Curated annotation (Swiss-Prot):
Gene Ontology MF term list: 3-methyl-2-oxobutanoate hydroxymethyltransferase activity; magnesium ion binding
Catalysed reaction equations from the record: 3-methyl-2-oxobutanoate + (6R)-5,10-methylene-5,6,7,8-tetrahydrofolate + H2O = 2-dehydropantoate + (6S)-5,6,7,8-tetrahydrofolate
Coiled coil in keyword set: no
InterPro entries: Pantoate_hydroxy_MeTrfase (IPR003700), Pyrv/PenolPyrv_kinase-like_dom (IPR015813), Pyrv_kinase-like_dom_sf (IPR040442)
NCBIfam families: panB, PRK00311.1
Annotated protein name in UniProt: 3-methyl-2-oxobutanoate hydroxymethyltransferase
Oligomer and partners: Homodecamer; pentamer of dimers.
SUPFAM superfamilies: Phosphoenolpyruvate/pyruvate domain
GO annotation, biological process: pantothenate biosynthetic process
Co-factor: note: Binds 1 Mg(2+) ion per subunit.
Name of the gene: panB
Residues bound to Mg(2+): 45, 84, 114
Amino acid sequence: MKKVTVSGLLKKKQAGEKITSLTAYDASFAKMFDEQGVDALLIGDSLGMVLQGEDDTLPVTIDDIAYHTKSVRRGTERAFVLADMPFMSYATPEQTYANAAKLMAAGASMVKMEGGSWLCDTIKGLNLRGVPVCGHLGLTPQSVHVFGGFKVQGREASQAEKLLSEAKALEEAGIQLLVLECVPSSLGKAVSEALTIPVIGIGAGKDTDGQILVMHDMFGISANYMPKFSKNYLVETGDMRKAVSKYIEDVQSGAFPSPEHSFQ
């Protein structure tokens, strides 16, 4: 199979083809997802919750992400690999460049950062140093204490307008992908249509350019909790590989996410 690149993901958007993505944290699952045809794999700071048992993503370190990025890269031949910049790992320019370099050296093809237009100068600096950037707007888990919990964002007209404005600013600054999390479906559609870069949704409705799920949610192995925007594909198919294949099929056909997995 041909190796997935950021330009290839852009071509998918331009052709109206949905992008499929999952989180991955080790070589074995990365290999499985890669072989099934998932377009992009994210080493997410969600590992703090699903692997380390934390209540949120804040304790995750850059070394944690680098370790798992190395593992995922070893299991991946064709999928595009993104790695999260964890909480407070990009507080200053010097810190940002050093930490991004660590993730790229570990095997990432792009780093993902949570935040709005305040990141624009940082994004420009990373691009100048050869580091591609993915943005992340909507519910940004590193800001959970600012939001007062894991809540849907952008329901108020003023919030939606601000988010759309920030998405445009991030694109202008140089991001090449955007993850949009937990926003009303109408806002997910508006952002995707307003940007030329691919928008990957998680709880952002079916009209984004692609979808991403946390693998533990897709397999139904997150302890006692299933987010509204997720679907347990393992219980439906009874086999991990079939679950991944069904997820890809549903995203590409537009069957997932359905209204029950979306916010209004």
